[in-house]
Amino acid sequence: VRLVGSEMCIRDRYKGYYKNKNLPTKTIINENGLLLNVDVENGQKTGYFLDQKSNRYLLRKIAHGKRVVDCFSHTGGFALNAAMGNAKHVVSVDVSKTALDQGYQNAKLNHLEDKIEFVQADVFDYLDELKENEFDIIVLDPPAFTKSRRTVQKAYNGYKRINKQAMKVLKNGGYLISCSCSRFMETANFEKMLREAASEAGVILKQVSVTQQNADHPILWTMEETSYLKFYIFQII
């Protein structure tokens, strides 16, 4: 918008991103030393969930020698960081074959394909089939289970189910990484769910780290919707 005297000139407004046949929409980014293929046009969000960058690095720091499963892995962000941190074995689980295929290409790009097993499965079913003590670290980073206040209780039940499943099969002393990216699942409610899941699973949660989104996704106190990501690392005792 540009004011000229008493008249207002308005340029045509474009919706979405400007698409040019000569503009590539696939690129490779570097995240803490990991090379990652990103499909800006067809991928979820901007092709990669940049808001979890610093949180994925936290996993890398505790992964050495551990058996790790990355649930709802998308293109393998957490799984790749676990492998980069010299985990003993890593499993990347997602229902989307397309996401898993891209995750495998990311693993190849970093010469980590021999360290990660890619499994196409429904995470709820996969967790049901796990044996106790099979993994040292379980990452739960699901898509938003609720995108409105009307479905919060349904989302609460879904979060509780997967967290309880994970708590029951993790080895004693193992780590649970639990996330929610829904702003409608408020922090107090999410923590209440975690306490209930732990009680029903018969475990105690020892808090290791609590964070939110990466700094390049700023939280504005005048806009409550900007505070949406909840990230917890617990040790199971």
Residue spans for each PLM region:
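Glycine-rich adenosyl-nucleotide cofactor-binding module
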Residues: 13-86
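Helix-to-beta-strand junctions that scaffold the AdoMet/dcAdoMet cofactor pocket
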Residues: 112, 170-172
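Conserved SAM-binding motif I beta-strand of class I
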Residues: 89-94
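S-adenosyl-L-methionine
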Residues: 98-139
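Short helix-capping segments at alpha-helix termini
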Residues: 86, 108-114, 199-204
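C-terminal catalytic and target-recognition region of SAM-dependent MTase-like enzymes
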Residues: 134, 161, 175-237
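Single conserved hydrophobic/aromatic residue that forms the stacking wall/gate
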Residues: 1-10
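Mobile active-site "lid"/loop adjacent to the S-adenosyl-L-methionine
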Residues: 136-165
